[in-house]
């Protein structure tokens, strides 16, 4: 009986080994495992015959059966690894990727029209040697008003025009404080522009509580109003892509003397008169002037030795003129249908 069991064990091992070699896929290999090692498999059935063996033969035959199971399991495991590798290679071959094909483009946004205007302004002035400087949006009264020769009784310092904090600080109403801080830190001559957000208590079709402004400043021994006029004429020709007539009107600003407001020929009607320019043929775009001596004194610059000019204009206003936008609020409503046009 013992010899018969040994022959059966060897026969089953040979059958299993041959079947494993012939297996071509994982499903077939799994079926072989069930046929030989499963609950009703050939080796499991063979173990049931141990009851008919003598007490001396049982442990020997039982050990041989377990060795056979381990051997078959090892062959199946090795074959499984081989088949999985072949399966992966076949899948990769069927799903070949052409790495030379262009990738899929992600959906991208576009620059806001005000940002585009800011970049155009920065590009122009940086080519002329102007530094682009920035400063805090929360300011003190000194930098926002006093150093700019704006007295305490000036309307701009009233609560209804300026956003104040409880500690006396405020949201800057212009980017001029950046110029004051720069003049404190640098020695003339220098030239700079200061773009940024500013805040005022105002909201209608042409005004928002927050808007974008850029101011320019030049301090030198030979600064003249004529030089400023020439610069502005060249800037607007660059910005709008054509020569535009400019008109300087006398005005008043506490921080400049003399002061002027600058109008450009209406970009919609070429100066003929339309609704955009209220039929005047002109559009107001900025204020400017020669830096007031008191402003220079406040930052320890001798007004007898150095002179300067300054200007300030709204970037939102320029964006409206450049792109033909008739309502300022459209720039701040985050309407993607509108913004994607730019």
UniProtKB/Swiss-Prot annotation:
| GO BP terms | phenylalanyl-tRNA aminoacylation
Q: Name one Pfam family in it.
A: tRNA-synt_2d
Q: One GO molecular-function annotation for this sequence?
A: tRNA binding
Which cofactors? Mg(2+)
Q: What class of enzyme is it?
A: ligase
Sorted UniProt keywords: Aminoacyl-tRNA synthetase, ATP-binding, Cytoplasm, Ligase, Magnesium, Metal-binding, Nucleotide-binding, Protein biosynthesis
Q: What is its main location?
A: cytoplasm
In the UniProt record, which is one GO cellular component term?
cytoplasm
- EC numbers listed for it are 6.1.1.20
Catalytic activity, as annotated: tRNA(Phe) + L-phenylalanine + ATP = L-phenylalanyl-tRNA(Phe) + AMP + diphosphate + H(+)
Q: Where in the cell is it found?
A: Cytoplasm
Q: Which SUPFAM superfamilies match?
A: Class II aaRS and biotin synthetases, tRNA-binding arm
**Keyword Metal-binding (UniProt):** yes
Q: Which residues bind Mg(2+)?
A: 257
Can you quote the record's cofactor note? Answer: Binds 2 magnesium ions per tetramer.
Would you identify the family this protein belongs to, as annotated? Belongs to the class-II aminoacyl-tRNA synthetase family. Phe-tRNA synthetase alpha subunit type 1 subfamily.
Q: Which HAMAP family match?
A: Phe_tRNA_synth_alpha1
- Tell me, how does this one assemble? Tetramer of two alpha and two beta subunits.
Q: What is this protein called?
A: Phenylalanine--tRNA ligase alpha subunit
**Gene designation per UniProt:** pheS
């Amino acid at each position: 009986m013992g010899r018969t069991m040994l022959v059966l064990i060897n026969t089953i091992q040979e059958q299993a080994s041959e079947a494993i070699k012939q297996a071509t896929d994982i499903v077939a290999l799994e079926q072989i495992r069930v046929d030989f090692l499963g609950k009703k498999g050939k080796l499991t059935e063979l173990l049931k015959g141990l009851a008919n063996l003598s007490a001396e033969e049982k442990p020997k035959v039982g050990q041989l059966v377990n060795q056979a199971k381990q051997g078959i399991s090892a062959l199946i495991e090795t074959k499984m690894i081989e088949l999985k590798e072949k399966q992966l290679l076949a899948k990769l071959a069927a799903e070949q990727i052409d790495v030379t094909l262009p990738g899929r483009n992600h959906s991208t946004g576009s620059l806001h029209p005000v940002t585009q205007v800011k970049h155009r302004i920065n590009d122009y002035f940086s080519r002329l040697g102007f530094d682009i400087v920035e400063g805090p949006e929360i300011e003190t009264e000194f930098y926002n008003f006093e150093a700019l020769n704006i007295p305490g009784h000036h309307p701009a310092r009233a609560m209804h025009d300026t956003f104040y904090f409880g500690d006396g600080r405020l949201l800057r109403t212009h980017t001029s404080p950046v110029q004051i801080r720069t003049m404190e830190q640098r020695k003339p001559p220098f030239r700079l522009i200061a773009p940024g957000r500013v805040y005022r208590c105002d909201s209608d079709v042409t005004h928002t509580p927050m808007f974008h402004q850029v101011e320019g400043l030049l301090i030198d021994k030979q600064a003249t109003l004529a030089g400023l006029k020439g610069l502005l004429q060249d800037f607007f020709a660059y910005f709008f892509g054509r020569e535009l007539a400019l008109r300087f009107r006398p005005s008043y600003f506490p921080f400049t003397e003399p002061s002027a407001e600058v109008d450009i020929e209406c970009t919609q009607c070429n100066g003929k008169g339309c609704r955009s320019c209220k039929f005047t043929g002109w559009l107001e775009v900025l204020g400017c002037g020669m830096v007031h001596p008191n402003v220079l004194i406040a930052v320890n610059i001798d007004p007898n030795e150095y002179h300067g000019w300054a200007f300030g204009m709204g970037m939102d206003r320029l964006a409206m003129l450049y792109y033909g936008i008739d309502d300022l609020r459209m720039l701040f409503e985050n309407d993607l249908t509108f913004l994607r046009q730019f």
